[in-house]
A protein has these predicted regions:
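Glycine-aromatic micro-motifs
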Residues: 1-113
């Protein structure tokens, strides 16, 4: 869990934004520097997303240091494509995030003008 933020769909992709009292469930991987460089390219770092070091609370364990990609500012809310939405749902299922904490709310906010 990452605390004090919530999910948003911006330009049709997920990011997190500050939101006091809210939390976002996350999946955690240990990656090598080479893997990180590959993910950087995939995520459009540093132009589309930037990286931030965060404390992540692990279920059944304590906090760990982690890194998250956050979308650069200025991008409007926008609905995700069907393909991207299905990919996100699959990720939630893969990590057994059953109640989809905040995901449906982010989807609904993306519909608003």
């Amino acid at each position: 869990m990452i605390h004090n933020c919530r999910l948003e769909f911006r330009r049709g992709f997920l990011t997190i934004v500050p939101a006091e009292g809210s939390s976002v469930p996350v999946g955690v991987w240990r990656i090598s520097k080479a893997n990180e460089a590959s993910v950087d390219r995939y995520e459009g770092y540093p132009t589309f997303y930037y990286k931030k070091q965060v404390r992540v609370m692990i279920d059944g364990g304590g906090p760990v240091n982690g890194m998250v990609y956050i979308m650069q500012s200025g991008h409007p809310r926008q609905m995700p494509s069907d393909f991207y939405w299905r990919t996100v749902i699959q990720g939630y299922n893969d990590f057994a995030i059953g109640n989809r904490c905040g995901l449906q709310e982010a989807f609904e906010r993306a519909r608003l003008p």
